[in-house]
Amino acid sequence: MQRRTMIMNYRMVSQSAVALALFVVSASAFAAENPHAAMMLKCAGVCADCQVTCDSCFHHCASLVGEGKKEHAKCMHLCVDCAECCKLCATLCARQSDFSAIAADCCAKCCDDCAAACEKIADDKQMAACAKSCRDMAKMMK
């Protein structure tokens, strides 16, 4: 039952990321005329990519925790928090919300923490990819 719920949640997250990506693509014509809008849309796209990477790493860590590898639990929690922050930031940036700067600060902090946790577990390609995505995201937000 727990695996079924996890799969359903993963599908919902993937669908929301696809919807956001389509929104970003459709808004590109407007962005071509407005440099600020172009930057906001670029940020939204990078946020959406990081969200997908963090959600994937969350799933990876959840599987490992299920196998008894408890050292992945903290990373698992940080990945899901980071994915949510990235999702919020992507949405607000795509809308060019006045609150996007606040979301970007929160996103940078979450990404830094997530990257640090993923980097602690060596020799795991999934976690290395998540750490890189988060580091790149945090750098862009600062």
Residue positions per predicted region:
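Intrinsically disordered, low-complexity terminal tails/loops enriched in metal-binding residues
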Residues: Q2-S14, F23-K142
